[in-house]
Amino acid sequence: MQIRIENQLKFLAIADSMKQVFRQTTLIDGSRYENDAEHSWHFALTAMTLFEYCVLDGVDINRVIKMAIVHDLVEIFAGDTPAMDTSANISKEEREREAADKLFALLPEEQAHEYRSLWEEFDAMETPNAIYAAAVDRFQSFYSIHMSGTGSAWVKFNATSERVRTRMLPLKTAIPSLWQWVENAINENISKGLIIK
């Protein structure tokens, strides 16, 4: 029991490092970049808030919230990989698998298995839970960038409207009622010069 709880507490201390992993997405007020912990919290809250619009059958919102909490934990060791950074995405899978091995090994076996399976399910994006989670994860980032008016990651990585639309496709599948809002936001950001047509 004592070793178990000590390992869990060590894991929690390392998980606190998510607050120091900064993303390429700014806060809505544009004052600074958000960190992984803030993103994960906003992702979970967005999943809860927009769940009534999900059209996928069999989605377990509690599992989606767990995915939101663990989906970026590996970035503590692997670092953030911006979606629009094509060169960084080349090594993403390998870096994140190595990080998952290192991070989840800190937990007791059954927790390690649960957390890793949540992370792998999210990453594979094959189940209704994972598709909804991916849709919300991507929407949260899109929404923050759009609402900030800075274009942050879109400008930095010369994002085209095609790349942004492709990135947002899980939303069209899981929450189609939001798709027109996304299209309007993309067009608005094209007109502002923040997304390349």
PLM features: residue spans?
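Alpha-helical, largely C-terminal catalytic domains
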Residues: M1-K197
